[in-house]
Amino acid sequence: PMTTWRLGLDGFDPEQLVGPKQRELISSAEFTIEPIMRRRFRVAMEATWSLLNDSFEQNPLFVPLTEAEFKYQADQMLVVFDPRVSCLAKVGGEPVGVVVCLPDVNPLLRATRSRLQLSTPWHYMRFLRSRARASLIFGGVRRDHQDRGVAGITLRHAITGMQRAGYR
């Protein structure tokens, strides 16, 4: 089953996602959190694929993705990807958690009528400047790091990035 929530970012304090476990993890010299950047997108997506399959393995409704299936979907994301709203968490340099968010592309699809046309580049540039909503596509934490505060930290990082970027 899938559930969808809406979160208005105006007035939301991402610090409420930080508790004792998160503070302890943040203070660790081994822990880092970094945005998923375009220049290292493919490397980050390899880690993301691994984290997705590992973190959802115990879910009886989850069907693991092959690397080719995940790569196909990830390559489609690159066109609209915003590095300010997605991140990888690492412990000792090893990826342990991820949050992947994408801007809402519906305004772009509506403006272009879902067709590639002469005006599409103009609509795309307009879309890049006026993104207001984002969707959390998925978040996951490697099984051996679950219940240690990683999820709260990655969510805080993504939501803070959305707020700074002007998402509502």
What role is predicted for each listed range?
Residues 1, 152, 163-166:
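Conserved active-site alpha-helix within GNAT-family acetyltransferase domains
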Residues 1-35:
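Acyl-donor-binding surface of acyltransferase catalytic domains
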Residues 6-9, 141-146:
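Conserved beta-strand-loop-alpha-helix junction that forms the acyl-donor binding cleft
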Residues 17-25, 120-126, 158:
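Intrinsically disordered, low-complexity boundary segments flanking structured domains
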Residues 35-141, 156:
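A conserved beta-strand-loop-helix scaffold within acyl/acetyltransferase catalytic domains
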Residues 133-134, 162-168:
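Conserved GNAT acetyl-CoA-binding A-motif
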Residues 145-157:
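Conserved acetyl-CoA pyrophosphate-binding loop and the N-cap/start of the following alpha-helix
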